[in-house]
Every structure is written in structure tokens, then in C-alpha cells.
């Protein structure tokens, strides 16, 4: 099941959060339709901006839209003209006051949506699909927070008459593990032979207790204080028998005790047999 379903929806409420956050009673269908229209508006006019994610949050009379982009300068525009245009279009679409937040993506190579968009752009420019997939995998695996990646292309690959699907994978991508932090992205490439779908799964470690494993992982002995052996208080153990020095005949003699006559017999027998 984890191989087929969208990884983000599969983990909702467990390790992932909703991309649209609002509450509605009778306006539920209307709000869903508006959310779809907002995402289409932002994706259609800002292909070059590298939008990784769009989050929508609603109140009674306001709509907040957070745009996560790799190139915030394109979204903002010169002196904020592009951002003002986007805000005006969103207010015209929703009929409410819109708060627009533009957030920069720090590592575009580790974002599945941006990786899929990059591969799709190369396919549109007639780059060989295997070369584009391998290049994307190599650049993603250089990131410290990426543990595994899978890239899949589906369609008339290489202009073949029959469509097929091919994928490359490196590292671990546990799609069935619910605590795994899986980033998923989908993008379609428009070529002369038709559409080619590009899907990307990126594994970034396990989320345990609300924290990512990579961030929470620390050396085992870093927090635990190191125990020091007290000098001169503990008797030394002999390596062969595992007893203290006072437990042997030599120890008893050194301590002023007389060795039992029957205790020396097994020792001598052992030495003669050896």
C-alpha cells in the first residue's frame, strides 16, 4: 500500500501536517475549490520561480498564503511589483484580504518537488532521461539530510511507441514505514512525443517523538558522564582465573595466610597435565 499511495497523505496526522489549515461547516466545498484555484494560479504563472510548496490558512475574513520558493526574487519582483500583482489576483479570486508570505527554500536539491521539476525541464529540453535522473540523484545524495532517493519517469521515454516506466534508486526509501520522513514531488514534462510524468521520493530520516532522527542523533557517550575508576581502592583481578590476588596461594602467602595443603594439589595436577 505504501508503494502506491501519496506518501504525504499516507502520513497525515502522524508525521506530516495538512497543507490547508482551516475549519468550515457549510462552506467546505467552496473553500476546497478556492484552494485548488489558488494553487493552480500560483503554479501556472511562476514556473521559473521554483515553488516547492504552498500552504493556505484561513480565518473569518483573511486568507494567509505561504509560498516556499527556491528563487524568492522572481516571486517578489522588482520593488515588490510581482508580489503586489499576485496578492491582487488572490484577493480578486477569494474576495477576502490576503496575507502573502514568501519563504526561501535553503536546500533546493533536497526538495522532492524541485528535483522533479528540474528533471522535467531537462526532459523538455531533449536531455536523455537516464542522464537527467542520474544527475538529479547524485546532486541530492550530496546533501547531508538526504538518506535515500528514488526518481521515476513514465511515458514515451526516448520517443518510443509504447510507453513504459523506469526508475533509479539510491539509498533507503522505506515507503511502508510511517515514522519515515518521506518528501514526495510530481511534475509533468511537455515533450514533442507527449507528456512524461516525473515522480521523486526523498527519504530524510525517521521522525521519533516529533524530532527528526538526524537532528536528534548525537554521540551515545556525549551526554552521559564518564565514570572514573578510583585509584588504589579496588583490588586488581588476575586475567586467567578472574579472582583477586588474595584468592590465590601467592596472595594468601603475601597476606600472611597459610595455603591449605589440599588446595595446592589441583594446581599442581593442572600444571603437570599442561
From Swiss-Prot:
Any one annotated GO CC term: plasma membrane
Pfam families attached to this UniProt entry: KH_2, Ribosomal_S3_C
Keyword field: Ribonucleoprotein, Ribosomal protein, RNA-binding, rRNA-binding
InterPro entries (alphabetical): KH_dom, KH_dom-like_a/b, KH_dom_type_2, KH_sf_prok-type, Ribosomal_S3_C_sf, Ribosomal_uS3_bac-typ, Ribosomal_uS3_C, Ribosomal_uS3_CS
Region (Disordered): 215-274
Classification via SUPFAM superfamilies: Prokaryotic type KH domain (KH-domain type II), Ribosomal protein S3 C-terminal domain
Example GO molecular function: structural constituent of ribosome
SMART domains per UniProt: KH
Domain KH type-2: 38-106
GO biological process terms, semicolon-separated: translation
Compositional bias per record (Low complexity), positions renumbered to this chain: 238-266
UniProt keyword NAD present: no
Function summary: Binds the lower part of the 30S subunit head. Binds mRNA in the 70S ribosome, positioning it for translation.
Family named by the database record: Belongs to the universal ribosomal protein uS3 family.
SUBUNIT field: Part of the 30S ribosomal subunit. Forms a tight complex with proteins S10 and S14.
Protein name: Small ribosomal subunit protein uS3
Amino acid at each position: 500500500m505504501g508503494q502506491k499511495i501519496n506518501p504525504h497523505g499516507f502520513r497525515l496526522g502522524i508525521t506530516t501536517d495538512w497543507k490547508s489549515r482551516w475549519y468550515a461547516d457549510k462552506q467546505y466545498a467552496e473553500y476546497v475549490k478556492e484552494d485548488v484555484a489558488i494553487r493552480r494560479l500560483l503554479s501556472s504563472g511562476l514556473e521559473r520561480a521554483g515553488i516547492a510548496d504552498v500552504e493556505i490558512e484561513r480565518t473569518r475574513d483573511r486568507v494567509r498564503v505561504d509560498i516556499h520558493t527556491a528563487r524568492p526574487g522572481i516571486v517578489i519582483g522588482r520593488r515588490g511589483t510581482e508580489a503586489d500583482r499576485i496578492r491582487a489576483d488572490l484577493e480578486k479570486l477569494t474576495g477576502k484580504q490576503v496575507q502573502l508570505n514568501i519563504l526561501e527554500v535553503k536546500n533546493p536539491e533536497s526538495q522532492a518537488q524541485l528535483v522533479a521539476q528540474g528533471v522535467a525541464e531537462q526532459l523538455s529540453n531533449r536531455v536523455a532521461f537516464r542522464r537527467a535522473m542520474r544527475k538529479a540523484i547524485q546532486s541530492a545524495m550530496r546533501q547531508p539530510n538526504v538518506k535515500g532517493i528514488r526518481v521515476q519517469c513514465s511515458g514515451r521515454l526516448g520517443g518510443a511507441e509504447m510507453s513504459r516506466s523506469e526508475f533509479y534508486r539510491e539509498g533507503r526509501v522505506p515507503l511502508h514505514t510511517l515514522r519515515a520522513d518521506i518528501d514526495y514531488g510530481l511534475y509533468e514534462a511537455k515533450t514533442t512525443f507527449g507528456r512524461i510524468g516525473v515522480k521523486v521520493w526523498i527519504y530524510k530520516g525517521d521522525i521519533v517523538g516529533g524530532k527528526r532522527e538526524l537532528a536528534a542523533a548525537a554521540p551515545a557517550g556525549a551526554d552521559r558522564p564518564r565514570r572514573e575508576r578510583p585509584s588504589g581502592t579496588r583490588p586488581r583481578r588476575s586475567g586467567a582465573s578472574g579472582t583477586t590476588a588474595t584468592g590465590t596461594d601467592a596472595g594468601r602467602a603475601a597476606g600472611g595466610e597459610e595455603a591449605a595443603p589440599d588446595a595446592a594439589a589441583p594446581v599442581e595436577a593442572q600444571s603437570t597435565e599442561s
